[in-house]
Amino acid sequence: VYHRIIDKSVCSAEAISLKRALFFVFCWIFLRIFIEGVLEAHHSIGFASFSYKSLLTYFLHFPLFYASLFFLLVIIISALLKEPAGKVTKVASIGLGAIILVPLIDWSIGHGFMITYPLRLEPYFMNFLNPFVSLVHIGVSPGQRVVIVFISLLIAFYTYAKTSDYFRALGLFFLSLGVIIIFGGLTTLLAANHPERIFATGGILYTDTQKYCVLYLLLFSTLAFLYLFMLDRGFMRSVCKTLRLERMTFYGGLAIFGFGISLVYKGVRFQVGSFNYLGIMTMFLSLALGYWGLQVFNDLFDVGTDRMTGRNNPLLKGVKRENYRRFSMMLMALALCYAVIINFPASLILYAYLLLGILYSLPPVRLKRIPIVSTVVIAVAVILSIALGFSVYYGGQAINALPAKILLPTLLAVTLGFTAKDIGHIDGDKAHGVITLPVLLYKPGTFSGRLPIAGLVSVSYLIYAFFIPQVITGAVLFGTGTLLYTLFTKRTSELFYFVMLYLFGAYLFYMLIRISPL
């Protein structure tokens, strides 16, 4: 009888759509966070008064914790039971509702407890399953302990419904219980049992909340991509083949470039530390993922051009347009999450970067169709990327704080130099009304036909020498190398131009440090 009831419940849950299941996950998580704030020790809506830190806590830190654990369990169950990840998600989205019981139980027992990550691991691991030992003093409430065991039992029941195997059900019970317990103590484990030292205030990620957020966002990002791969391998393989790593590296690297220059300009010494390195990674990922999201968004409107040029557009290989659009939105949302962890001004800078990228691609505005304007837009995006790195120490003044010796030559040089990116798309752009400078000026068949664009690209390096005379040697070398390559190569490679940009950027950074202040 019980087996039939469980089977019927599982079949009913599997009948819902995946979209609705994910919406349930969203609802349960935020309902739990809301109730926890009101009924646990805080007795306050939102845990604290309105602030940047409280926003991170409510909308990033806690949701990322629950979402990461949810997808981790779904991935484990799906892999071990060889059940489709989508089906497991649908059932798990109903069972996740158990998490709202935690504050209800705690409130009924003692009017709420202060829930934190376990302050010490020994009592947490040794006594978690011992009902006679309280763990409230290390931040673990009775409600948490009861519900974690209950959720593990639900997983065991689901396993039995799918396999009719008591031993596998028992194994999944203990495995899921262990995973949840270890996950709950993950930050204390990473801090070598002394979270008060590792998560102390200071550094690029200044508050403990920012540090917690970046850890769980990195974990969530990894699990989200793994989950999507399990949902639809064909889709993810097609999408990953379109990665433009050289451009993602370029934009992410610009944030690091800006951060490095701001250190020199501000007179701050970089402090070596794991969370400072994670802060640098956070800057990089915010722009790298942001660019990837915009690239996917641009693919939605470049199908005709890509068909002619032979570029790898997943929409030409059967990927559904709606799924591709959602993937673009997901990447942009992840990018914004990384940016807001750096600081609030960084999120506004990235928001402007994304909006600019949307206007660049979206008809009827589609700024990429207009000569000069298209590369001016890219130049502004480059400046925003540098400003994001500046925002760590300059906050809302980041753009105004950019030295004119960087701002002006970058605006001019990128406007001219990025004409090279369109050399390989001339036929497709011409056929679809996208008028770029290469469409107007570049003729690959002759030396004289390649000269105008070769000259523009090489001059872009020399512009820096006009504003910063100390870099004239490097500017001449890089400009000459790019000129010769563009003149004598009929089929140019975009990678060459980006490698030259990376090398010149490193050279420019070195020279700016030597001649500081700017």
For each predicted feature, which ranges?
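Multi-pass alpha-helical membrane architecture of UbiA-family
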Residues: Y2-L518
